[in-house]
Structure formats: C-alpha cells, structure tokens
C-alpha cells in the first residue's frame, strides 16, 4: 500500500475523538481507514516527557482480522524553546529516507502521524543486558556516522547558553537561588574550555538515548533508534555520556522523575560499551582509544547534567505532562556539583 505524506491545517487535538478525525482526514487516501469512529481505538503511551504519544488501532477495510496501527505524536507545550520544529521535521524525514526510524505519514497543526514500528520498546532493565547493550553500542556508532545535511558544527554549548537564558526568564527568585542559575554561565564556559579538543570526534548525535527511544526486533535483534527532536552534531563522547546517565532512570516507575545513581554503570560496563562501540566498524581498536573515550564520556556527564537540569526547569514552567520536572532538575544539578570536583579538579 502506498502511503502519502501530506501537510494539513487540521486544528489542534484535545481529545481521542479529535485524534480519530485526524487519522480519517490524513489517512483518507490510504484505502483502509474505516469511517466508523467507534471502531478506532486510541491508546495513550506512557513514558514520553516532551510530547504526548498515542497509538491508534483499527480493523481495516480488508477484513476484521486485519488490523493497522499508527502512532500519533502531539507536540508538548513550549517545545519551541528547546528546538526548531521545522528542523526536527527535516531531520525526521531525512532519517526516514536513509531507512532509519518510522516513516512520516502526515502532519497537522500541533502534531503528526508516524508509521508504527512493529518492534519492542526497551525497558530500563534492558539497558543492562550485555547482549542488548552491545547491539545499542553498534547502532549508536552507525548513527554517529550518518552524513546529515546542514552544518556540522557542535551545538551543545550554544544550546546550553540559550536554555540558560530561557530558564532565567522563567524561574522565580527562589528557583534562581535553589538551582544556582546565576553562576551557571561560568560553569558552561568552564566546561567548554576544559572539554573541547581539536582531536575529539564530532558526529551526528541523538542527545536523548534513553531506553524509551530504542526499539528492538525480537526476531532479528535489529535496533531502531527513534525520536530525533534533540539530535544535532556534537562530540560523540557527550552522546555516550548521555546514554550512561540515562541508566539511572526508570520513566515507567511509580516515581518516574526519581533518578537512582547507584544504577549508574560501573567502569567495566562502560568500558565494554565503548569497546563494542569502537570495534563495531570492523577496524582495529587500541586500548588507548578505548581509555580516551571512556575518560571523555565520563567528563561529558557534567555537561549532560546541566543540559537536562535546564530542560527540567523550563519544562516545569511550560509543560503540562504529569512529571515532576523541577525535582528532576534538582537531581541533575545535584549530580553536577557532586561530580565536578572528581572529574575536573581531581
């Protein structure tokens, strides 16, 4: 079946009925979308913290036993403070063109329809399975090597400074003091000076490689990395650092905002991931290369804590998703100040 992508001026969605009408409108040319709204099932998907995500299921016109699924993504409030939606759409379409991730099926004013990938989204525990972690490491190396259009400049430091300005504009005087926002520009400057090197490898980074953005085909073990909203060119060590930090999170627990840093991977687990990452291309990898990237990734966790700490403050003011963004931010900044003496001054 040919799937057409089109842009629509459909108004915003605020209910399951709205989502069903979006599907009927954008899918009118597919030839298998039923007209009876009662036969369309809308299922909210948990774990998203930037957008609201739904799955729509329906029996197709080809028969009651033949079902289709699509994914509907409703853009979160205030996301334009974090990234340019037009650029994100271009990245999404480019990734689809390269055979990565889901296809874009249609757009409406505050969201889009995506192909539903028939694979299992990973759980927090999956990241700690050695074989699965190896698959992710190899896929991440492949991701970093993508030749994406546009400038290949590092975006990390510019983005941190932009987000800091937004956080300061939104924060109350009490929050300014609690999160030590006045001094963060100096911290960002220090990190950029200490972590930037001419010989560091720059790649197209996902920047949000938490378990919910990784899917696995349980037959072939093929890994699919999804959700490219924060993607940009950055030091690969930063992206690996982000992945390691995400091992402290479980966004499907009763307290999804709580981070458990006793779960942060030990040196042996991190070394294995990086060795697999570097060796996945088939080229010989030296111990020196592994140790250098291991050290760099650990140092870049500091930038990662500031990144997601600022994200938490901004989101706490603009996003209506049920998640304790401010407490999440507090934990990320706490880790920054705890780890900084060990990683920069030790």
UniProtKB/Swiss-Prot annotation:
It comes from Arabidopsis thaliana. Belongs to the choline/ethanolamine kinase family. The keyword Kinase applies. PANTHER family: CHOLINE/ETHANOALAMINE KINASE, RE24176P. Induction: By wounding, and salt and osmotic stresses. The keyword ATP-binding applies. Expressed in roots. Expressed at low levels in cauline leaves and flowers. This is Probable choline kinase 1. The lineage of its organism: Eukaryota, Viridiplantae, Streptophyta, Embryophyta, Tracheophyta. Its EC number is 2.7.1.32. Pathway: Phospholipid metabolism; phosphatidylcholine biosynthesis; phosphocholine from choline: step 1/1. Keywords: ATP-binding, Kinase, Lipid biosynthesis, Lipid metabolism, Nucleotide-binding, Phospholipid biosynthesis, Phospholipid metabolism, Transferase. It catalyses: choline + ATP = phosphocholine + ADP + H(+). GO terms for molecular function: ATP binding; choline kinase activity. ATP binds at residues 73, 210, 227. One of its GO terms (biological process) is response to wounding. The gene is CK1. Involved in phospholipid biosynthesis. Catalyzes the first step in phosphatidylcholine biosynthesis.
């Amino acid at each position: 079946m040919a799937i057409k992508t089109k842009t629509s001026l459909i108004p915003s969605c605020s209910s399951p009925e709205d989502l069903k009408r979006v599907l009927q409108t954008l899918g009118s040319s597919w030839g298998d979308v039923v007209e009876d709204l009662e036969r369309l099932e809308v299922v909210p998907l948990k774990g998203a913290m930037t957008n609201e995500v739904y799955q729509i299921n329906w029996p197709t016109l080809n028969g009651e036993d033949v079902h289709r699924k699509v994914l509907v993504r409703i853009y979160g409030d205030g996301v334009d403070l974090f990234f340019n939606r037009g650029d994100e759409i271009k990245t999404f379409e480019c990734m689809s063109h390269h055979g990565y991730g889901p296809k874009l099926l249609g757009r409406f004013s505050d969201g889009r329809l995506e192909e539903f990938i028939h694979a299992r989204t990973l759980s927090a525990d999956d990241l700690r399975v050695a074989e699965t972690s190896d698959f992710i490491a190899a896929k991440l190396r492949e991701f970093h090597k993508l030749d994406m259009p546009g400038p290949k400049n590092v975006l990390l430091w510019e983005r941190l400074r932009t987000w800091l300005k937004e956080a300061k504009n939104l924060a109350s005087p009490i929050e300014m003091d609690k999160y030590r926002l006045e001094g963060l520009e100096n911290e960002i400057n220090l990190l950029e000076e200490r972590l930037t090197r001419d010989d560091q490898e720059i790649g197209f980074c996902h920047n949000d490689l938490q378990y919910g953005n990784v899917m696995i085909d349980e037959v072939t073990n093929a890994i699919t990395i999804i959700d490219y909203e924060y993607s940009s060119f950055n030091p690969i060590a930063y992206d690996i650092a982000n992945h390691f930090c995400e091992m402290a999170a479980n966004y499907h627990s009763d307290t999804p905002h709580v981070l458990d840093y006793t779960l942060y991977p030990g040196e042996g687990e991190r070394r294995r991931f990086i060795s697999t990452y570097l060796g996945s291309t088939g080229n010989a990898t030296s111990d020196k290369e592994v140790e250098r990237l291991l050290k760099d990734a650990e140092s870049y966790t500091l930038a990662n804590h500031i990144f997601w700490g600022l994200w938490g403050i901004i989101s706490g003011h603009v996003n209506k998703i049920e998640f304790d963004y401010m407490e999440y931010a507090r934990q990320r900044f706490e880790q920054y100040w705890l780890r900084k003496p060990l990683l920069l001054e030790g």
